[in-house]
Design a protein with these regions (language model features):
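Small, basic N-terminal interaction modules of short regulatory proteins
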Residues: 1-55, 81, 85-94
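Short, glycine/alanine-rich amphipathic alpha-helical segment
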Residues: 57-72
Length: 94
């Protein structure tokens, strides 16, 4: 069976199938990044904003683990926001 035959049997257009696939991928990514953010919040028992303030206030005392975690957490937070935007755009897309 070819891909074209499978698409035909679904009764959906190629665009609809692609949109659904993209949405499922985006939801999966969002879930992953939400879980990673939750791990950092649990580990440090504070929000990202509060953790940023704490790490930035400790300029004389370097804690490489916390600084690395801050960079990771900032990346994860940015990725979470980006995927959320993609989900919103996919919901609005034709």
């Amino acid at each position: 069976m070819t891909v074209s035959e499978i698409i035909e049997r679904t009764g959906q257009s190629e665009v609809a199938i692609l949109r659904e696939h993209l949405l499922l991928t985006a939801l999966s990514k969002r879930s992953r990044y939400e879980a990673e953010c939750a791990l950092f919040e649990k580990k440090y028992e504070q929000t990202l904003d509060d953790f940023q303030k704490r790490v930035n206030a400790q300029r004389r005392e370097e804690d490489f683990t916390q600084e690395d975690d801050l960079l990771d957490w900032e990346f994860v937070d940015a990725a979470l926001k980006w995927w959320q935007t993609q989900i919103e755009e996919l919901h609005c897309a034709d």
